[in-house]
Amino acid sequence: MSTYSNIKIGIIQFPGSNTERETFMACTRAGMKPVEFLWNNDPNELSEFDGYIIVGGFSYEDRSRAGVIAALDPIMGQISIESEKNKPVLGICNGAQILVESGLVPGFENNQVGIALTDNKRVKDGQVLGVGYYNTWANLKMSAEPSRCAFTRSLEKDQIIKIPLAHGEGRFAMPESLLDNIIMNDQAVYLYCDEEGSTPNEFPVNPNGSLYNLAAVCNSKGNIMAMMPHPERTENGDQIFSSMKEFIQMGNPITDHVLVHNQESYSLKNYSVDESCTEWLVNMIITDNEAVSVQNILIQLGYDVVLTRQTHWEIKTAGENENILKKIKESGELYNSNKEFIGKRAANKETISILIHQKEDMHGRLKQESLTDRFQID
């Protein structure tokens, strides 16, 4: 264990990371020594540090899913090894997304991925106000016992702090059965709330539609936390960093909690379009950097693949089909004809197409409301 003045915290940064300056300042205010550590440094050098903070930003431009490419970098394998020594790891915003995609949170055996951080949704009185990126100040309630987590020790249970948030994919999502286990295990450590501490699950108190108003979740042992808001951007969040310091000074006192959950297994099924719907598969005219990034990481992992991406729309009309489809094309809502075009399914026998969509398609719902309300297309 380091002495007070020599507590070294590795500030982990990837291409596209930001807020490192604010994180340095927060660590310094807490009496810790922040040290920059880049994704392409020698991962073995991470053993020199007492703890780690993965900063916010947009690693690898959030391509594919926010945090997923960074989660596959070799540095995260070493972070996992260091966390097994009970060292504290804090992921803020994009850092939280990286921890979730790497499986370090919620903390299943072998770091199996169990939860997701998906697109924000802002819904009030049944109306979609917006999806995607949003920034505001939010009230957070610390909902666990102070000793539960490395990042709660300086706060009282039910204490409220007000800190900023700024993200596009910050909505915690998971199976209800897993959520129940996380709540019972006291891993739901910070919740969005109003000024009185109530937690109505609706915008604006819940700024991103997160399940159970989750703002931060820790792993079962309590030494790792994924937090979407930004405590480093304000002195209001300093207690999170002083908690980290105290945890290190006390010798990394983890808890004996164990997260048990039976993960469902999934298999691919053949998909057919509803006969009453028109299917549009939208291709990019320009280079699809997102597809290229995913292809490159798959090749690095040993998969010899060529990957392309299409956006899938299914349109069901109630009136004159061709006339309505023409109006939708002209609206530009579903695709931009300057850089996209309606393509076809791949016919090559060596090609497999996998359809991926959100369990709750907020983007589709927003587009439908826009076509109906803004363009008067029924």
What does each model-found stretch correspond to?
Residues 75-84, 155, 275-277, 351-354:
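Short, hydrophobic/aliphatic alpha-helical segments
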Residues 10-13, 36, 53, 91, ...:
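Structured core elements
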Residues 2, 41, 80-81, 116-272:
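Amide-donor transfer/coupling interface in amidating biosynthetic enzymes
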Residues 25-29, 179-181, 232, 242-243, ...:
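Short, solvent-exposed amphipathic alpha-helical segments in soluble enzyme
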Residues 1-106, 121-134, 205, 211-212, ...:
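N-terminal beta1-alpha1 cap of cysteine-dependent amidohydrolase-like domains
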